[in-house]
Design a protein with these regions (language model features):
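Basic, Lys/Arg- and aromatic-enriched nucleic-acid-binding interface segment
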Residues: 9-38, 42
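Short, polar N-cap/turn motifs at the start of nucleic acid-interacting alpha helices
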Residues: 53-55, 133, 154-167
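Short basic/aromatic active-site micro-motif
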Residues: 27, 133-151
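DNA breakage-rejoining catalytic core of tyrosine-based enzymes
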Residues: 1-13, 73-82, 99-101
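Conserved tyrosine-mediated DNA breakage-rejoining catalytic core shared by Y-recombinases
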Residues: 47-85
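Short alpha-helical segment immediately N-terminal to, or the first helix within
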Residues: 34-35, 147-148, 161
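C-terminal catalytic core of Y-nucleophile DNA break-rejoin enzymes
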Residues: 70-90, 102-124
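Alpha-helix N-cap/helix-start motif at helix boundaries, enriched for small hydrophobics
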Residues: 31, 43-48, 158
Length: 167
């Protein structure tokens, strides 16, 4: 299997521009940016709940801790939300007020949380329709980590951000 494509800033902008023309654009922009800037796996995005991103005062958190059940490696890990993500999450949350803070952050028309598989199809479709060849649901995570590595971020920091315990 080939590696997911990494995106240039221009390609990411094309993807974000494309999402603006579609239904559920606030949700889709937030999902794309969570994979790119928080370097979350699609399964981790699907597992997010409102309480993971919104504090008791209704503000978007700067960081959160994903539980072991929410991560691929079954190990809790800390995730940081860049300002770009917080702005998009705030726009999404303002338009989709939760009934309960424990409810899934991203949900279907029946108010059920998306499965990782469904979100994979959504993200892959966004990349395809935006004309990004070779991009998959893993491209955002790979792009974010690659960009940090190219800027000289240390391997141990990258491992922590990625939730990897081994090189």
């Amino acid at each position: 299997m080939t590696q997911a494509a990494t995106l240039t800033q221009q390609q990411l902008q094309r993807v974000l521009d494309y999402t603006r023309t579609r239904r559920h654009y606030k949700r889709n922009r937030a999902i794309i940016l969570l994979t790119h800037y928080a370097m979350l796996r699609v399964g981790e995005v699907a597992a997010l709940r409102y309480c993971d991103v919104v504090d008791a005062d209704g503000e978007i958190k700067a960081e959160t801790t994903l539980s072991a059940a929410q991560t691929k490696g079954n190990k809790a890990r800390k995730v940081w939300f860049a300002e770009k993500i917080r702005v998009e999450l705030a726009a999404y949350v303002a338009a989709h007020k939760p009934k309960q803070l424990t409810q899934p952050l991203f949900y279907t028309q029946r108010s059920e949380g998306f499965t990782a598989n469904t979100l994979t199809h959504i993200v892959n479709g966004i990349y395809k329709h935006a004309g990004i060849s070779g991009a998959t649901s893993h491209s955002g995570r790979r792009t974010g980590l690659t960009n940090l590595a190219e800027r000289g971020v240390g391997v141990r920091v990258l491992m922590a951000l990625a939730g990897h315990s081994n090189m």
